[in-house]
């Protein structure tokens, strides 16, 4: 069969461009190791069908704990070992102190003016100071103790009302407790539209995380519309903005006393005093951070802790015995009575090791072209620290995949980012500023659920039949809701 000249030229052209796309250009630049890539999508095909944190971990085991990934048009460095985490988050902490701009941050976080996504600079430094001294200080977290105790007691009563031997949706109950605590901490009272607010936050969380088309092709604006992402986010933002505006208006009329300042009180005081350059949108973005980020991470941690304990009857028996001995039949739990219980805290630390709330942390972005340990890194390269892989590194953790709270008994490892083999809240300048609040919102709900009830799986299932499948979003949640049968 004859082939026309036009066809030959077209085929030759296609082959030429495929060759140019598939072959790496020869250059004197030192490049990080990476998997083989495809045109346009880069390395995305290696991650299709995987949980991102697990897929990236598997690639790192093959190509190295410091590797490069091309995610669509986004160039990214992936760190998957304590050694490289320490090197980059200390030596290169400032060069990688920025956050990449995202469609979600632009629309939901009021043009990236919240604490998590704000670009590195004076505004972010002031926000960080605000968190340390006002919003998330130990004193402020302590001031919300009575809220936590009251809402945890409400959950206990709800479980009892459902009846001994009747399956109870713990996923729903835990999320509700933490969401209500945080909304009361923010606004001083239960939100009239609490259910609507919670549903909006859940919508945001569903739209966040993973490798969305808008995140891997940030410059292709038409894809943001074509995928429906921009429309969905705009709809969520409009509902959220209206709700928060109403809450702020109500709060301005009946604000709390200086002694019992809510988070919103603090922000409005600073805004009105002009000692900090806050706009109305900035206030809303920060409040959303307090509520959205705190609810999802804490509720996921409590769920995973109970899930692991169900699958490990030895640990469940031990932590419940500790609680019951310490509390000695008390009707209601006070926070200070359980804060220093050794085994309860070991359970929480081990849960955070196996199930860090943000397994890929929040990505950072390089602020300038630089040389990293002999490798050339372009400006705006994304930095992904896979704490999921780091927390399970077999070089640092014996039986790394096993749930074993006792591994921390004689360990000086802390959660505060100083030990790079254990980074549940990240490390460096952009480490999560809400760790104290997050831990308080994990410890007390978990203690209440374990102290008052014995738990088993429905329908006589054995403990090892609990489904531990993950669902990836803003955080890694259980794919199926945690339905357990209480007895009391």
Curated annotation (Swiss-Prot):
Residues 24-488 are lumenal. GO terms for molecular function: germacrene A hydroxylase activity; heme binding; iron ion binding. Residues 1-6 are cytoplasmic. It holds the Pfam family p450. It is a single-pass type II membrane protein. Heme binds at residue 432. It catalyses: (+)-(R)-germacrene A + 3 reduced [NADPH--hemoprotein reductase] + 3 O2 = germacra-1(10),4,11(13)-trien-12-oate + 3 oxidized [NADPH--hemoprotein reductase] + 4 H2O + 4 H(+). Involved in the biosynthesis of germacrene-derived sesquiterpene lactones. Catalyzes three consecutive oxidations of germacrene A to produce germacrene A acid. Could also catalyze the three-step oxidation of non-natural substrate amorphadiene to artemisinic acid. Belongs to the cytochrome P450 family. This is Germacrene A hydroxylase.
